[in-house]
């Protein structure tokens, strides 16, 4: 199937919004998986007209890195807030296709349903791939919340019009929180548990932290011929 033309093609503002709303109604907001052996971290980086998409596959219990898939291509879509998945989704799909080990769950550096139309990149790509997914962002896109306590594991819910769409989660004592929302085929409570389990030494969960590092290095090497 040509996923890019079906799910990530710009159709004009109104039609693209309609597509987002249509897909968002199909998002599964409960745990729809049994075993969790492999987890994937997903991130992209862009410089000038190049974009790198990375998926890092780790063993869930040990967080041992098993595989890294990197794809680099031309940027074919401008940066438009609320439509990030149309810019980054296609390169992530290419990275997914090249994986020998397919993760049981993906953690994205970005939003899940904590999005104006409840379809951030974690939800959009998770739905297209039919894979459980979580959004874990460094900044909030939309919604209101109270600051959680300073202790690791503390969290407060994110609300949009009195609807719970995510949680602000403290992954380290006295460090800025992350913004967690379910992506697809997972509950918010399980999403929070997994983010805390995979956040060991740093603010960001290890799969996402590593994906970010690899995407930056890959793009720097592609453009400048040197590693960071």
Swiss-Prot record:
Residues flagged as site, Interaction with target DNA: 79
Record keywords: Cytoplasm, DNA damage, DNA repair, Endonuclease, Hydrolase, Magnesium, Metal-binding, Nuclease
GO biological processes: DNA repair
InterPro entries: Endonuclease-V
Subcellular location: Cytoplasm
Gene3D superfamilies linked: archaeoglobus fulgidus dsm 4304 superfamily (3.30.2170.10)
Enzyme class, spelled out: hydrolase
GO cellular component: cytoplasm
Catalytic activity: Endonucleolytic cleavage at apurinic or apyrimidinic sites to products with a 5'-phosphate
GO molecular function: deoxyribonuclease V activity; magnesium ion binding; RNA endonuclease activity, producing 5'-phosphomonoesters; single-stranded RNA binding
Job of this protein: DNA repair enzyme involved in the repair of deaminated bases. Selectively cleaves double-stranded DNA at the second phosphodiester bond 3' to a deoxyinosine leaving behind the intact lesion on the nicked DNA.
Protein name according to UniProt: Endonuclease V
Organism: Dictyoglomus thermophilum (strain ATCC 35947 / DSM 3960 / H-6-12)
Gene that specifies this protein: nfi
